[in-house]
Curated annotation (Swiss-Prot):
Plasma. Prominent constituent of late-pregnancy sera. GO terms for molecular function: endopeptidase inhibitor activity; protease binding; serine-type endopeptidase inhibitor activity. This is Pregnancy zone protein. It is found in: Secreted. Keywords: Bait region, Disulfide bond, Glycoprotein, Protease inhibitor, Secreted, Serine protease inhibitor, Signal, Thioester bond. Belongs to the protease inhibitor I39 (alpha-2-macroglobulin) family. Homotetramer, which consists of two pairs of disulfide-linked chains. It comes from Homo sapiens. The gene is PZP. The keyword Secreted applies. There is a cross-link at residues 978-981 (Isoglutamyl cysteine thioester (Cys-Gln)). Glycans are attached at residues 54, 69, 246, 392, 406, 753, 875, 932, 997, 1430. Residues 685-735 are annotated as: Bait region. Is able to inhibit all four classes of proteinases by a unique 'trapping' mechanism. This protein has a peptide stretch, called the 'bait region' which contains specific cleavage sites for different proteinases. When a proteinase cleaves the bait region, a conformational change is induced in the protein which traps the proteinase. The entrapped enzyme remains active against low molecular weight substrates (activity against high molecular weight substrates is greatly reduced). Residues 1-25 form the signal peptide.
Amino acid sequence: MRKDRLLHLCLVLLLILLSASDSNSTEPQYMVLVPSLLHTEAPKKGCVLLSHLNETVTVSASLESGRENRSLFTDLVAEKDLFHCVSFTLPRISASSEVAFLSIQIKGPTQDFRKRNTVLVLNTQSLVFVQTDKPMYKPGQTVRFRVVSVDENFRPRNELIPLIYLENPRRNRIAQWQSLKLEAGINQLSFPLSSEPIQGSYRVVVQTESGGRIQHPFTVEEFVLPKFEVKVQVPKIISIMDEKVNITVCGEYTYGKPVPGLATVSLCRKLSRVLNCDKQEVCEEFSQQLNSNGCITQQVHTKMLQITNTGFEMKLRVEARIREEGTDLEVTANRISEITNIVSKLKFVKVDSHFRQGIPFFAQVLLVDGKGVPIPNKLFFISVNDANYYSNATTNEQGLAQFSINTTSISVNKLFVRVFTVHPNLCFHYSWVAEDHQGAQHTANRVFSLSGSYIHLEPVAGTLPCGHTETITAHYTLNRQAMGELSELSFHYLIMAKGVIVRSGTHTLPVESGDMKGSFALSFPVESDVAPIARMFIFAILPDGEVVGDSEKFEIENCLANKVDLSFSPAQSPPASHAHLQVAAAPQSLCALRAVDQSVLLMKPEAELSVSSVYNLLTVKDLTNFPDNVDQQEEEQGHCPRPFFIHNGAIYVPLSSNEADIYSFLKGMGLKVFTNSKIRKPKSCSVIPSVSAGAVGQGYYGAGLGVVERPYVPQLGTYNVIPLNNEQSSGPVPETVRSYFPETWIWELVAVNSSGVAEVGVTVPDTITEWKAGAFCLSEDAGLGISSTASLRAFQPFFVELTMPYSVIRGEVFTLKATVLNYLPKCIRVSVQLKASPAFLASQNTKGEESYCICGNERQTLSWTVTPKTLGNVNFSVSAEAMQSLELCGNEVVEVPEIKRKDTVIKTLLVEAEGIEQEKTFSSMTCASGANVSEQLSLKLPSNVVKESARASFSVLGDILGSAMQNIQNLLQMPYGCGEQNMVLFAPNIYVLNYLNETQQLTQEIKAKAVGYLITGYQRQLNYKHQDGSYSTFGERYGRNQGNTWLTAFVLKTFAQARSYIFIDEAHITQSLTWLSQMQKDNGCFRSSGSLLNNAIKGGVEDEATLSAYVTIALLEIPLPVTNPIVRNALFCLESAWNVAKEGTHGSHVYTKALLAYAFSLLGKQNQNREILNSLDKEAVKEDNLVHWERPQRPKAPVGHLYQTQAPSAEVEMTSYVLLAYLTAQPAPTSGDLTSATNIVKWIMKQQNAQGGFSSTQDTVVALHALSRYGAATFTRTEKTAQVTVQDSQTFSTNFQVDNNNLLLLQQISLPELPGEYVITVTGERCVYLQTSMKYNILPEKEDSPFALKVQTVPQTCDGHKAHTSFQISLTISYTGNRPASNMVIVDVKMVSGFIPLKPTVKMLERSSSVSRTEVSNNHVLIYVEQVTNQTLSFSFMVLQDIPVGDLKPAIVKVYDYYETDESVVAEYIAPCSTDTEHGNV
């Protein structure tokens, strides 16, 4: 070791003797700085420094990519010294990115400097974000959202968005928009959810021009908005030194008032490991009544929580539940407190990243406790390079201390600084958590300089706030000899942010005699262009070409140039009053406003659009180092001529590769440098004897270490809080009637005027809550701006709430409760009135008083016993009015509010008749040809009709689809809960749109309505899709169902036809077609898969030929060409089937023949079509110019009815297929075809129900399809009219006229007499469509039925208080009819008045293999049973009392065959305590 040191010293002496003194050089110096990452289509800068020029030169920059060479800039420079930055813009490139060569040339008469280096060129990517109007939606609501695009400077981009789509939780695409042009950088879209969407997480997906994919999630679920919020205040951090912890729990209504009730709080520490079997988690629980402020506060001793014991999580889990007084509504909130054993913690808040010999090394530390609270006046220790020498310092009142290290005599290359308060304790106890005193450490490398000249930018602590000018201190030490003959030295600086040079400048320093030490200040405005991170580089070139410089990083507040302010005026306003939303932004900004009920945000907090979230979209926030594929610099390839360097007679021997140099500063900022100056430290290529540890230590012992005595001013961010304007208020309104309760209130785009202001007049909704509003604005000049949240509290000093049941049966008695709440600070005297009505009788239960005294934050509840007298919807109007009174409330004087002295709430009660509702419909198509046509209408009622329940109406329409168009989403008075039934909500819209298009009657209003139904129906149908592309009646629920061939074909053709009107994902069509092709057998027929719910058509559909005919029809209606292989093969199957069918007996295969006739017609096989139609004509039922077809095995019609029953579903369906076969005859139907079709249509129209549908789903779909084809084939525009007169035998008579102007208008009148005899007369010269609908209730009677039904309650009698409020409904059913099994059966259980089903117990029924689905709809429970046989099925579920009702009437349970609705049975049940005279149910 000693020998090596002697050899090293000898070598150094030899080099000194051989070295020659270097002379100062005044050669021209060049430096060009360009970012290594360049974005296209946006201005970029490169900075040029020329020094000591002695001739005019041309500076040029060019970019070479592929075969293209593009000039970026050219500058002619005549000045001796020049520093400036030049702007240039790159055009968009074909690829998203490419590596290019940047060439710099500086050329003059004697100068020719050339450098070439790589840079990465990227196409500019827009920053796209999505905002929804709220974070969660209920089924059936409309999702509204905005798509916004800005560039990297946050200015709006009017780009073309190639694709936007919505995905449901199964990742099915349910909507899409293509080639959407953004205007002013924004576009607003909306999408209606179906009434039964898949619940879960949805997402909006945006694909940008550059190929980027942005996703924004939202949730769809059924929910009830919370009335109040539970706020839990616990310390974020609990120290093991704490003896007590304060827990505060408050309940606050969304309108800001305290909640009365009981709070229960539990505090738990869970075990940290499951293996701790010898311990149990520690929990404490307490309950208290909330005080008048809606809060409780409790001190908990930490010993009870064992916070110093090991084996538990270092967390305290707090759960608080508040049960609201009066309603027992519970809301829960959870919080977690971290438990820390950190007693003190030191951290560097401001420290030099490197050190420079001769410039003090500065550092600032902050001492905090485990909760982050500063510890003042505390002594701590400072150690340098782990030496045995320590210094110390004391923190100030803010817990801060600043110190410096004198670096003059430091000769090593690394500085290791450690600060600590307590020496580490190596002892450890397994049962107790030990105190932890954390120190901090920092390593700084030395900066290399040949001359010992340095410049240093002092770091700044914290984040710099926008809107002020920041001053940066630059310290320097300069070797006078290195200055040569300079009289002044120019320091140049530039600032980079987001990877772009944004600022530049120069500071000139006079050169003094002798070595120079000192500092100067640089300042720059802190604005959005330097956020979020600014990097400053300062440098100067000495005469010999050495570059001295430094770089520093500054954290900048995320801010935007467009300052947006949003405020409500007034900030508190009563419901239904007028308010103003004021927006201030950069002039001509377009502002997007949103205001949401705070309850929505309480239920589903969302990641709000904020300045931070927008900054997170930036592709480059801070450019550090070079991109991987351009990390090559020409200078890096230089050779190393010798292992030492001589400068001014001194020898420099590199000791470490960790030293920093100018090149490392530039590279750290991502800057490419083109220069002939000295920016690198010398390279060490040979092994140099290392310096001993002792030598390193001595270097630091000589360092002076001391505390800098200067005050510290923390640099904290400041925000301007603009108070809401409370000067304006709405005028006095004597009374409010509240009925408008939205979840999203404001969703608008508003343009700001040239003064930068916009004011929007709004009407406050009726919800008593707090509305949270936000806005973002877009300006071409100022870019994007985002407001802070503005609030409006919708509130009135007192209001009334009503409690009543959803429905009652006439004769029942219920209690109507009205609660008046007073939130005025003073007492008021209130008069509460229930508006009288002939529709009900009411008597007040409490002692009748003219007015009631209600003091501040108190409530008064009044009740009435109500007996409804009329049927239908009955309105109850309750008003609470503050009265003038000289009478005292207690000891207080009564006050009257200045505004909103009266509050009125109107709620509707459905009063139903006793018994079971029946509906009879009489429909006909009547054509007058100049002569009068009369019909007799005899309306009779059965003997068991319920008094006053009968009502009838008469309707006239001029269009064959008029009735269906009026009720397109309500064609059947039946549930739609399966995949087939949903299609009756979907398919008819297509037929209506096609028909109105063909007849040129389609209006925008009708189109918008039908398209909306298609969109929601499409969503619903996807619920029944299988992964393989098939569909089944109830979807892939519980893995019980296979894909259904028939339903898949039905959905496939309907989706394909809907493509003309709405977006349908092609993947759904392709997958279904593929699945069906796999079902095709070698003989061309299709294999049956899955189960059908309608046995009436199973005989045909399960037969290969019938199913194959149906599937072929579906494929042809897509339409697939006849030449398609699947269709061509199917034709072989159908031809074989017809050859078999025509050999059958009379009446057999009627359904199959009807399908084959239509299929051959679509295939263009007219010979087969005619052959089949002739065969069917022989089997037709013809009567009174009406034609239809029946099944041979048709069930017998019930006897003893007043009216002929509606035709079964299967017969309407097969008759409609025959009609389609006539109408699709090619090349066109003959006059004979149309005559036959007219007689068929007349029969079909007579089967139509009051809503325009038929008896079930498939007959409705096929019949409306056929009627639409008939209507289009026979439609003619004529000026002729028709008159319709309806009159009775007395004085009633009404006339209607039908002409071209009112073809689609539903003309309707109520008929006065029931029972009654009416005469209908039609005159004129056109066809009209007449319909009479009669409804009445009958009392249940024992009848023969193919179903056996038994219903009972558990308990059966009123055997205790619990039976008043809850009981179980149990029922059994079986099928006793002529068939082996029923079709799908609906069990419809109506609730007893005042009771509601317990939904979880209903849902559990779906676990049964016989139950396919359950629904809770209003006051009914629906159970879908796939089929019922002679085996008894049992079901049961619980019901709970919601509202007390007295004199309870029995409720009805109805079981019916969905496809043969005449097959039904009805039974009654009664609540156990409905006849309890002692307690009653009230």
